Amino acid sequence: FFEMSNGEINSTELVAALINQKDNLIEGIQYALDTVDGSLSMLILTPVGIYAARDKMGRTPVVLGKKEDARCACFESFSYLNLGYENDRELGPGEIVVFDEKSCRTLVAPGDKMKICTFLWVYYGYPSASYEGVSVEKMRYNCGKLLARRDNVDVDVVAGVPDSGTAHAIGYANESGIPFSRPFVKYTPTWPRSFMPTIQQKRDLIAHMKLIPVHDLIKDKKLLLIDDSIVRG
């Protein structure tokens, strides 16, 4: 669920209020997971350790990492791999654990209903991330391969809409034998995700300013462009 924008209450305050409805932290976390109509995963820092809970349907990941005398939890494992941590495991749907620097203990066992968000692989996930043992980059590459097997088109080059469309395009190009090219490059320092604004004119402006054409790779060419998804029609 989204943080409320009127400044009166936000999602963290709301979840904390739900947890406080019960007599102890574990019952409170379970109550919050059951009450919220949607996905809710959380980390709670306490004096005895960090409590981690994954939403009851497993839509959003929680992964655990470890190294000597240290443990961590986050949304994607790539965030800690360069810090010397290694993967421990992913929490299951509705699972609650508590961990400190030395150990991790399961407080509520995972459920058996997994409905992870497939958009993690298609768009949201960082290329080096994996969810439930499936690599984001490899999945996107394989999607491109399958598209190439289905198609029969006469084009000069294959290109992806950066960034998350790039792996799809490379898979397509390698499978089809059509050269891969980069006729568009992305400039991101000052422009956010183009699908997020609610006004179409703003979305058009962001897309226009963020994608910079390489005209020498476009002129007189037949291009096949692959994007990862169509969030808005």
Where are these regions (language model features)?
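Flexible loop/turn segments at secondary-structure boundaries
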Residues: 51, 59-61, 80-82, 105-106, ...
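Conserved short alpha-helical segments that host acidic/polar catalytic motifs at enzyme active sites
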Residues: 1-92, 98-155, 161
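Extended, hydrophobic alpha-helical segments in both membrane/secreted and soluble proteins
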Residues: 158-160, 165-172, 176, 180, ...
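Short, contiguous acidic/charged loop-to-helix segments that flank catalytic cores in large enzymes
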Residues: 135, 213-214, 226-231
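Short, flexible loop segments at the rims of nucleotide/cofactor-binding pockets, characterized by
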Residues: 135-137, 200-204, 229
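A cytosolic small-molecule/anion-sensing beta-strand core signal
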Residues: 46, 219, 227
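Short, glycine/charge-rich flexible loops or terminal/linker lids adjacent to PRPP-binding catalytic cores
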Residues: 177-224
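Amphipathic alpha-helical
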Residues: 13-23, 162, 174-192
